[in-house]
Design a protein with these regions (language model features):
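Polytopic membrane enzymes that build or remodel cell-surface glycoconjugates and lipids
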Residues: 2-332
Length: 332
């Protein structure tokens, strides 16, 4: 009998470890952290900073009826035109009366939803979950956003931001999937955003930035035609904003403040916003003009033009080096 052949033991094939690319755990963590940060806001009351005029003593939102809804969309109120924001207050009052908790709850809920949309948009755009995590955490937890969430009247900020990013997501889906329905949704959501706050008109140039980042030819006929309805809506609501502010004398005459001073103050606001984003200090709900009319401007305000000049040179450098990711992030 021949000797049995020794059987070579089979090597165990190590199964590759599957990476869990599901963002659900990150999303839960980000939203949980944001909720914890804003828990104190549930106890906030109505402030005499516009909350009385816009909410508790606003005669057009106390009763939910057709006449009041028509009034919200057809008239200026308190020097502004944001009917969708006032309509959301009307709905809150029907649900919880004038209890501040219901208004605070809605603000926080909208902020959470927008934080989620930012996560989705950034991941959709860059396909890198770590960038989406950082961006959504910064938005959800940064001190500069506390005013918009914790102050009832600033509902217009959290509401317009929600529709703004929802519109961006829809437009980006239109670019990737080439389906017209996403374009229609982007336009509709943009309209909802400007009906919440006029600042949403910034979406129109943001779409051009998105086109550039996605490699589209900006002078292409189709690309130009796509932007016409967005810019038309933006111009219309820009005019409405000027008219609404003029109705209460909120727009100063040209000779009230020299154009050079206006430019310097704009640069100062730009510089301080960047600085407070990096190092949030001395935050306030109200930032008055630094000097009385006719007085000279302190040197620090003239120096605030330097960050704007530096930003221009930085953008030129980024474009020259074709660092499109950084250029897009900076401009966005």
């Amino acid at each position: 009998m021949g000797r049995d052949k020794k059987q070579t033991p089979k090597k165990k094939v190590q199964q590759p470890i599957k990476k869990n690319n599901s963002p659900i755990f990150w999303i839960i963590g980000i939203l949980t952290a944001t909720i914890i940060a804003y828990l104190p806001a549930f106890k906030n009351g109505l402030l005499n900073f516009d909350d009385i005029a816009y909410v508790s003593e606003n005669p057009y939102i106390q009763q939910f009826n057709w006449n009041n809804i028509v009034t919200l969309f057809s008239e200026f109120y308190y020097g502004g035109y944001y009917p969708l924001t006032l309509l959301s207050f009307m709905i809150d009052i029907q649900l919880g009366g004038l209890d501040p908790a219901i208004f605070n709850f809605t603000n926080i809920l909208l902020h959470l939803a927008t934080t989620l949309l930012i996560f989705v948009f950034i991941r959709q755009l860059f396909d890198r979950i770590e960038i989406a995590i950082i961006a959504s955490l910064l938005f959800g937890l940064h001190s500069l956003h506390v005013e918009s969430v914790a102050w009832v009247t600033e509902r217009k900020d959290v509401l317009y931001a929600f529709f703004f990013f929802a519109s961006l997501i829809s437009y980006n889906l239109y670019l990737s999937k080439k389906k017209q329905k996403y374009f229609v949704w982007a336009l509709y959501l943009f309209l909802m955003s400007v009906l919440s706050k006029t600042m949403a008109v910034a979406l129109a140039p943001t779409l051009i930035l998105l086109d550039w980042y996605q490699g589209r030819k900006l002078l292409d006929k189709k690309v130009i035609l796509e932007k016409i309805p967005f810019f038309a809506i933006g111009i219309l609501f820009g005019i409405l904003a000027i008219l609404s502010q003029s109705s209460i004398g909120a727009i100063a005459e040209e000779n009230t403040l020299p154009i050079v001073h206006r430019f310097v103050f704009a640069c100062y606001g730009f510089s301080m916003y960047i600085l407070k984003t990096i190092i949030p200090f001395g935050l306030s709900a109200f930032y008055p003009y630094p000097v009385a009319i006719g007085e000279s401007i302190p040197a620090v305000y003239w120096l605030s033009t330097l960050p704007l000049i530096a930003s221009v040179f930085l953008l030129i450098y980024l474009f020259k080096k074709k660092l499109n990711d950084y250029a897009f992030a900076f401009l966005f």
